Amino acid sequence: MQIPEPLALISHALRYEKSEAVFRTGDPADAVYRVLAGEVHLLRRAPDGADIVIHRARTGDFFAEASLFSPRYHCDAICVRPCRCLRLPAGALRQAIANEPSFAMEWITALSRNLRRQRSAQERLALKGTRARVVHYLVDCGESGCVTLDQPLIRWAEELGVSHEALYRALSAMEKEGVLARDGTTLRLLARSNGI
C-alpha cells in the first residue's frame, strides 16, 4: 500500500524490543501502526487475569485500526519479538482516507483482507479437534495445502487454540498416516479424507 506523501512525511518508523508495549489499554488512540518487521499481539485481559490474544499483526499488517475513531485504545499491543513499526498519526490518516480516493480504496481492501483472516481464524477455533484445525489452517492459509510457518510450533499451537502437546501429537500422527509431510518449518498436506 502506497502511503500518501502528506501522511508519509509525518509517519515514523519506531523500534521495539521483545515484550515491549507499543501502547496500553486506556492510552490515547493517537495512531494506527503497520508492522514493518516482527510481530505484535493485541491483548485483552480475561476476568481471571489471563491474556487473550485478539489479533496477531505480522510483517505488513496494520494494527489499532479499530481505534481510528476512538478516543482510547481498547487493548494492549505487545511485541512478541523485536519489531519495527510505522506509526501513522490518527488525524492525518483520517484526513488521507477522506482526501485520497485511491488510498481510501487500498485502506478498505486492507481492512477487508484482515476481516476475512479474522473470520477464518474464528471458524478454525470453532472446529473440534486439533487435526481439523491443522487441516483448516493448511488449506486456508497455505498454497495447495502447504505452509511455511513463521513462528515456533508452541506459538502456532496458541493460535490454533490447542496445547502444544496436542499439536505435536496430531502432527506426528498425521505424518505416520501419510497425511502430512514436514520439512523443517514447512508443512504440506498430502491427502485429505473425511477422517481428518
Task: State where each predicted segment sits.
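Short phosphate-coordinating micro-motif centered on Lys-Gly-acidic
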Residues: 21-27
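Phosphate-/nucleic-acid-contacting segments
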Residues: 130, 137-196
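Short, small/polar residue-rich loop motifs at catalytic or cofactor-binding pockets
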Residues: 8-9, 27-29
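Short alpha-helical segments that sit at the start of domains
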Residues: 117-139
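Cyclic-nucleotide recognition modules
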Residues: 53-109, 116
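Glycine- and acidic-residue-biased ligand/ion/polar-headgroup-sensing regions
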Residues: 30-43, 59-60
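Cyclic nucleotide-binding regulatory module and flanking cytosolic helices
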Residues: 1-20, 57, 62-63, 67-70
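Conserved hydrophobic "DFG−1" position in protein kinase catalytic cores
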Residues: 15-16, 34, 44, 79, ...
